[in-house]
């Protein structure tokens, strides 16, 4: 590891010579230490011009949004700490994760997911250590599920820490898997549209090699779906869920500003996902699950329908102050008002 400047193994220390690395690689052919050979090969790739450093990303330090939502804001089940990486992987694939964190500070974790998963079976989370971590992507998908999809899904990082807790932000490099279209609010729309077109071509040509996944991310939400939904996004690329979710927070009495932490969103983020059917839509402990039509609505930028707002309302319900299947409908009714629709009860 003295070859590299940090745990991401993306930059070499000074005075590393290609001829010397080649000699050591030749010698390593008779050496049982595969660990050493892999590092020498990485060093050779860098010396021969491969820009591994561009694969490194800095991990967000948003703090523990789940704890804040459920213990400070007192919502029933709102919030996720998942951080999208834009990398997906198939079940059985080997993934290497290189991590650099300040010495003695808490480490992030990694989550492997199943795209269009089951409400209580769609993710696996593992610890990370400094330097290299090797994983075989777990198979979560079941052939008994209603919607038949490829076994695999997005890779997420979980890092529920602030700079005060963790110091310098962790840096991570993931080797393996494949990139999927991921749009962060504020990204270049034209670049994203081109990524969508290219990914659609890959899915069409080799459907068994790529996960059918597209995600939109902003400070309010992760919105997960597939290329079917993304085609609608192409028609209205300026649309994101931010404005609609902001209205929900305002209605709940949760603000973006002010000094009282008990009433501030403080980075709490929703997790809205295309999932296997479990009713038309549902609210689980860490996400809201939708079917294709509802996911299309989210991607198209339209305001939610009754079912979507009803389920999100479950997450917003306040602990100790809600009546199941009743108070969550405040958000559904509020949605009706936003759209100037008539409520059948009012009639």
Kindly label every feature range from the protein language model.
Residues 1, 21, 43, 189-203, ...:
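Generic structural signal of hydrophobic/aromatic residues within well-ordered alpha-helices
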Residues 2-24, 99, 110-118:
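Non-catalytic terminal regions of proteins
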Residues 10, 71-73, 78, 210-211, ...:
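Extracytoplasmic low-complexity repetitive segments enriched in small/polar residues
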Residues 26-184:
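Beta-strand-enriched, solvent-exposed domains that form extended recognition/catalytic surfaces
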Residues 131, 143-146, 188, 198, ...:
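Short, solvent-exposed coil/turn linker segments
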Residues 173-215:
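Low-complexity, Pro/Ser/Thr- and charge-rich linker/hinge segments at domain boundaries
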Residues 199-347:
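Catalytic cores of extracellular degradative/oxidative enzymes
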């Amino acid at each position: 590891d003295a070859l590299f400047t940090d745990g991401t193994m993306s930059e070499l220390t000074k005075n590393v010579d290609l001829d010397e690395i080649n000699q050591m690689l030749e010698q390593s052919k008779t050496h049982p230490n595969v660990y050493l050979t892999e590092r020498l090969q990485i060093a050779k790739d860098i010396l021969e011009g491969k820009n591994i450093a561009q694969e490194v990303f800095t991990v967000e330090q948003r703090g523990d949004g789940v704890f804040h939502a459920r213990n400070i804001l007192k919502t029933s089940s709102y919030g996720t700490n998942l951080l999208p990486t834009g990398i997906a992987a198939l079940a059985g694939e080997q993934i290497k994760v290189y991590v650099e964190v300040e010495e003695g500070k808490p480490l992030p974790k990694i989550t492997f997911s199943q795209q269009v998963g089951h409400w209580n079976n769609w993710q696996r989370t593992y610890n990370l250590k400094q330097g290299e971590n090797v994983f075989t992507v777990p198979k979560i998908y079941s052939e008994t599920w209603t919607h038949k999809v490829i076994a695999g899904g997005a890779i997420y990082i979980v890092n529920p820490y602030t700079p005060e807790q963790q110091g310098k932000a962790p840096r991570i490099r993931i080797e393996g898997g494949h990139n999927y279209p991921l749009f962060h609010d504020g990204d270049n729309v034209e670049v994203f549209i081109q990524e969508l077109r290219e990914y659609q071509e890959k899915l069409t040509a080799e459907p068994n090699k790529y996960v059918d996944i597209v995600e939109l991310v902003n400070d309010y939400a992760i919105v997960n779906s597939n290329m079917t939904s993304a085609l609608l996004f192409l028609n209205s690329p300026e649309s994101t869920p931010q404005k609609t979710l902001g209205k929900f927070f305002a209605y709940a009495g949760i603000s973006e500003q002010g000094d009282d932490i008990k009433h501030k969103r403080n980075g709490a983020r929703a997790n809205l996902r295309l999932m296997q059917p479990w009713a038309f839509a549902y609210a689980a402990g860490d996400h809201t699950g939708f079917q294709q039509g509802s996911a299309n609505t989210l991607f198209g930028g339209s305001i939610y329908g009754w079912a979507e707002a009803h389920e999100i309302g479950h997450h917003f319900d306040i602990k100790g102050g809600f009546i199941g299947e009743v108070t969550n409908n405040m958000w559904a009714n509020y949605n009706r008002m936003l759209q100037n629709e008539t409520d059948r009860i009012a009639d």
